[in-house]
């Protein structure tokens, strides 16, 4: 797995919200009017788009994205994407990386809420991204305003061409009110709405990988920092999906062998004021939820008796000593 590029110019919504069009969370491209040159599912690939000079297939130049044939009969192409979770869309990235003479001149996005089925000709769509001029080989970060949750998107390209990647950033909708208070939920799961607020280093792997479902597929699918050459330790701050009392923790070092974190600990707090930006300082003084624990390579570590009862918390600071990698972090808790 390639290390996703962290775009310093990307808007805040790309860091604050999960990508609801991520196939690792369950998103799928269900239909396209045409995919002659490149299949629709490639557009949702979580890895950055690549260009391979000289690579051709039976349909022509191989492109890393969704690409339709040249239209000669009017009209335009579209692709339907089922989101991983129903969610309120906050922003999108229409990425035309490596598409230069074959990108669509414009695109728009419609949305629908269909919790029990797939779109039909009778589906009522709502425009969430109006027709927008596109450039070749570029990211197009577009804010989306609204409070309605959606399950499906229709990506329209005018009239044809290719999109390398589609990212749909939004707040997952979870029915917490109807949830059983006696059941333990993974409050650090991205699919439930948890997100990374701040991280001191993610040179080799993104901290957000800690929150992904399933076990890591390889060493690149986890949080890994550079080699520390000075005193201190590495850390990240995570906002939980819902306030809760943490009862069980899993720290998984899958695939990390010569570079796993030597030890880890967790601090936690119930944050009632301030902003995400102020947590970096506050977190240094949070109470200890899990004292330092020695880790093993390529292993799932579980903790229950070791946890302090801090009551309901909203945020945790995950500390690695002194550096290294961890694949996944699970924080099972009872809802407040």
UniProtKB/Swiss-Prot annotation:
EC number: 3.5.3.4
Enzyme class of the recorded protein, top EC level: hydrolase
Keywords: Hydrolase, Purine metabolism
Biological pathway: Nitrogen metabolism; (S)-allantoin degradation; (S)-ureidoglycolate from allantoate (aminidohydrolase route): step 1/1
Pfam families with a match to the protein in the record: Allantoicase (PF03561)
One GO term of the biological process aspect: allantoin catabolic process
Annotated catalysed reactions: allantoate + H2O = (S)-ureidoglycolate + urea
GO molecular function: allantoicase activity
Keyword Hydrolase: yes
Domain of life: Bacteria
Family membership: Belongs to the allantoicase family.
HAMAP family: Allantoicase (MF_00813)
Protein name in the entry: Probable allantoicase
Highest classification ranks of the organism: Bacteria, Pseudomonadati, Pseudomonadota, Betaproteobacteria, Burkholderiales
């Amino acid at each position: 797995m390639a290390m996703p590029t962290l775009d310093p110019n990307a808007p805040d919504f790309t860091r604050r919200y999960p990508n609801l069009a991520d196939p690792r969370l369950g998103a799928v491209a269900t239909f396209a009017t045409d995919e002659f040159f490149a299949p629709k599912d490639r557009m949702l690939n979580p890895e950055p788009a690549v260009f391979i000079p000289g690579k051709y297939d039976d349909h022509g130049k191989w492109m890393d994205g969704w690409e339709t044939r040249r239209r000669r009969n009017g009209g335009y192409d579209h692709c339907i994407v089922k989101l991983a979770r129903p969610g309120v869309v906050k922003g999108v990235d229409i990425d035309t990386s490596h598409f230069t003479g074959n990108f669509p001149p414009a695109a728009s996005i419609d949305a629908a809420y269909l919790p029990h089925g797939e779109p039909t000709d009778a589906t009522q769509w709502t425009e969430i991204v109006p027709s927008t001029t596109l450039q070749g080989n570029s990211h197009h970060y577009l804010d989306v305003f609204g409070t309605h949750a959606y399950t499906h998107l229709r990506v329209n390209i005018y009239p044809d061409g290719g999109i390398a990647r589609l990212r749909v950033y939004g707040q997952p909708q979870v029915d917490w009110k109807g949830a059983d208070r006696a059941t333990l939920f993974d409050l650090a799961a991205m699919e439930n709405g948890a997100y990374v607020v701040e991280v001191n280093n993610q040179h080799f792997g993104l901290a957000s990988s800690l929150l992904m479902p399933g076990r890591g597929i390889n060493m690149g699918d986890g949080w890994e920092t550079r080699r520390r050459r000075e005193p201190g330790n590495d850390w990240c701050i995570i906002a939980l999906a819902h306030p809760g009392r943490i009862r069980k923790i899993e720290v998984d070092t899958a695939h990390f062998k010569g570079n796993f974190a030597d030890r880890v600990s967790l601090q936690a707090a119930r944050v009632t004021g301030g902003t995400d930006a102020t947590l970096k300082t506050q977190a240094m003084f949070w109470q200890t939820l899990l004292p330092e624990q020695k880790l093993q390579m390529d292993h799932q570590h579980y903790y229950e008796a070791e946890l302090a009862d801090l009551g309901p918390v909203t945020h945790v600071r995950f500390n690695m000593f002194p550096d290294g990698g961890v694949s996944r972090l699970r924080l099972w808790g009872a809802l407040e």
